Design a protein with these regions (language model features):
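Short strand-turn-strand beta-turns centered on an Asx-Gly dipeptide
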Residues: 362-363, 485
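Disulfide-bonded cysteine-rich modules in secreted/extracellular proteins
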Residues: 339-341, 411, 415-416, 465
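Sequence-level preference for short, compositionally simple segments enriched
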Residues: 20-345, 352-361, 369-405
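Sec-dependent signal peptide recognition
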Residues: 2-10
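C-terminal outer-membrane/trafficking sorting elements
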Residues: 438, 443-503
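Hydrophobic h-region of N-terminal signal peptides that target proteins for export
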Residues: 11-19
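Extracellular interdomain linker/stem segments of modular secreted and single-pass surface proteins
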Residues: 406-410
C-alpha cells in the first residue's frame, strides 16, 4: 500500500498539458489485505479530486455482504475521491445477497455521503431473489453524491438494480446494466454513453426517474438486448425526464414504449433516431403521448425529439455544470506500452499519460510500478509477462505485447531490436570500465544506455550500472558516468556496439 502522491489528473494551463504525476495503486485487495482493510485505509487517508485513493481488485469474486455488510448485507462506503479498479469486467465481481427486499437497505455498495467516485472494469451484483408480496427490490449501487464515473462496469440484479438517489452528476462509459423492473431508477443528471441495457424478464421496465434536476437520464448510443420483445423504456416515478438518443434496440420494446407513471406524470419521455439491430430506423408512430397519474395529473408529450431538440443533449450541456466537469477526459486510456527484456529486467518507455503500470505474469496480476522497468528476480525463466498502463484514475488500458522471459545475466543483452547486429564491431574495445574514470577504446561516438545495442560513430558515454540496475532519468539513485574515447572509424560499414555493464 502506498500513500497518494500530489496529483493523479492532467492539468492544463494556457493550452499547455502537463504530465500526470506517477501514483501506484494504494491498496491491492488480496495482497495488502481484504476489502474491509481497503475500506478502512481509504477512510484514514486525506484525499481530494487530485489525490484519488486507488483500490485494485485482481480477478476473483469478493463477497462484500458477509465481509463489510450490515445485517441485511448492505455495505456503506462514505469516503470521497476513491477509485474502484478491477482487472476485468468479466473477471471481477463484488457481490452480496440481501436478506430482506427494500430499495433503501439492500445495496451491495451504498455511497451515502461520498463524492467523486470512479469505477472501472468490474461487476457489482446483488444475488438475492427474496421477494415480499409486492416487490423484489435488491440494489447493487445506491449513490447520493456528485461526480460519479463508471467505465466498463456491469450491474446485475432484478428490480431497482441501480439507484441514483439524489441529484448529482454521473457519467457512464460503456458498461452493462441488467434487471427486471425499474432497474435504473432515481434522480440526478446521468449521461449513459454506449451502455448495454438488458431487460431480463417479460414486461420489464428499464427506467423510473424521479427527476429534480435539469436533464435527468440521457442515453446516447445505448444497446438494448433481451430475449423479450415486450419491455418498456420507462415509467415516471415522479416528474421523470428520460431520453434515448441513437439507441440500437436489438430487442424492440412494446409499441407504446412507455408506461403510465408510478406517482406523477413525466416531464419528458422521448427518443431520437431509435434503430433496430440492423441499424434501420424504428417506426415510433405508436409511442405513448398521453399520461395520467394517480393524483389526477395529466400530460400530453411528444415522444420523438426534433433534430434541434436532440442536439441540446451534449455531454457538456448535461454534465458540465458551473465547474466545467469533463468526465470523458477521466476515462481516456493510456497507450499500451511496448516491452522488451534487457538483461535481468523488462523495460519500456515512459508515458506521461500513465500514472503506473500493472504487471501480469502467466496471466495473473503480479505487481504495479511507477518505474519503467521491473527486475526479473522471482520470475521464472519461460514466464509470460505483459503490462497494462493505468490512466489518471487508475483504470487499466489494453495489454502490451507479451514476452517470454529468457535466462539472462547482468552482462547479457537480449534487446537487439535497435540496430543491425550483423555488422557488430567491438574489436578495438581495450577493456570494460570497472570504476568511474576508467576508459576503453571503441570505434565510434554516441551516447548509449547500458543494455542497448546502438550504432557507434565516435566518442561514447554510457551510464554506470549499480549492481545490475539501470541508472535512468528520474530514478532516485546516484548516476555515475563512464567516458569511453572513440579512436577509429571503419568506413563503409555500419558500426554497432553493445553497451556493457560495469562490474
Amino acid at each position: 500500500m502506498k500513500p497518494p502522491v500530489s496529483s493523479v489528473v492532467l492539468f492544463t494551463l494556457a493550452g499547455m498539458a502537463f504530465a500526470i504525476p506517477k501514483h501506484g495503486f494504494d491498496f491491492v485487495v488480496g495482497v495488502d489485505g481484504d476489502f474491509k482493510a481497503a475500506k478502512a485505509a481509504a477512510a484514514a487517508i486525506k484525499t481530494s479530486e487530485d489525490t484519488h485513493f486507488i483500490i485494485f481488485f485482481p480477478n476473483g469474486e469478493y463477497n462484500l455482504g458477509t465481509l463489510t455488510g450490515d445485517g441485511n448485507q448492505l455495505t456503506k462506503f462514505n469516503t470521497s475521491h476513491v477509485s474502484f479498479i478491477g482487472e476485468s469486467m468479466e473477471g471481477v465481481t463484488l457481490f452480496n445477497s440481501s436478506i430482506e427486499e427494500s430499495i433503501s437497505k439492500t445495496a451491495t455498495l451504498q455511497f451515502n455521503t461520498a463524492d467523486d467516485i470512479y469505477m472501472q472494469d468490474l461487476t457489482v451484483q446483488n444475488k438475492s431473489t427474496t421477494c415480499s408480496e409486492n416487490a423484489c427490490r435488491h440494489v447493487t449501487i445506491q449513490q447520493v453524491g456528485d461526480k460519479y464515473v463508471y467505465k466498463r462496469v456491469r450491474l446485475i440484479s432484478g428490480q431497482d438494480t441501480y439507484y441514483t438517489n439524489k441529484g448529482g452528476r454521473t457519467y457512464w462509459d460503456g458498461g452493462e446494466i441488467r434487471g427486471t423492473v425499474d432497474f435504473i431508477c432515481g434522480d440526478g443528471d446521468v449521461f449513459f454513453e454506449g451502455t448495454k441495457l438488458v431487460p431480463t424478464r417479460s414486461a420489464a421496465v428499464i427506467t423510473a426517474g424521479k427527476t429534480t434536476t435539469e436533464w435527468g437520464y440521457v442515453f446516447n448510443n445505448a444497446i438494448i438486448e433481451s430475449q423479450f420483445n415486450n419491455y418498456y423504456l420507462g415509467r415516471s416515478w415522479n416528474h421523470a425526464k428520460t431520453v434515448f438518443l441513437n439507441t440500437k434496440m436489438i430487442a424492440t420494446p412494446e409499441a407504446a414504449g412507455w408506461q403510465n407513471p408510478i406517482n406523477e406524470v413525466p416531464i419528458i419521455s422521448a427518443e431520437y433516431n431509435s434503430m433496430n439491430g440492423n441499424g434501420q430506423k424504428l417506426d415510433l408512430s405508436g409511442r405513448r403521448r398521453a399520461y395520467t397519474d394517480k393524483n389526477g395529473g395529466s400530460a400530453n408529450l411528444n415522444p420523438v425529439l426534433s433534430d434541434t431538440e436532440a442536439a441540446k443533449y451534449t455531454l457538456k450541456n448535461v454534465l458540465g455544470g458551473s465547474d466545467s466537469w469533463a468526465p470523458d477526459k477521466l476515462t481516456e486510456q493510456a497507450d499500451a506500452p511496448s516491452i522488451t527484456q534487457v538483461g535481468k529486467s523488462v523495460k519500456w518507455a515512459d508515458d506521461e499519460n500513465a500514472i503506473c503500470w500493472a504487471v501480469f505474469v502467466n496471466g495473473k496480476y503480479h505487481s504495479n510500478t511507477t518505474d519503467t522497468r521491473i527486475g526479473l528476480d522471482g520470475i521464472a525463466e519461460g514466464s509470460k509477462v505483459y503490462l497494462r498502463a493505468a490512466n489518471s484514475m487508475g483504470g487499466l488500458g489494453e495489454k502490451s505485447n507479451e514476452i517470454v522471459t529468457v535466462a539472462a545475466t547482468d552482462s547479457s543483452v537480449t534487446d537487439t531490436s535497435a540496430a543491425d547486429t550483423s555488422t557488430v564491431d567491438t574489436s578495438t574495445v581495450d577493456s570494460i570500465p570497472s570504476s568511474p574514470g576508467d576508459s576503453a577504446t571503441v570505434p565510434g561516438d554516441t551516447t548509449v544506455t547500458p543494455g542497448d545495442t546502438t550504432k557507434v560513430p565516435g566518442d561514447t558515454t554510457i551510464a554506470r550500472i549499480e549492481r545490475g540496475h539501470y541508472a535512468e532519468p528520474n530514478r532516485k539513485q546516484p548516476q555515475h558516468l563512464y567516458t569511453i574515447k572513440g579512436q577509429r572509424v571503419i568506413k563503409g560499414r555500419k558500426k554497432v556496439m553493445r553497451a556493457l555493464y560495469g562490474k
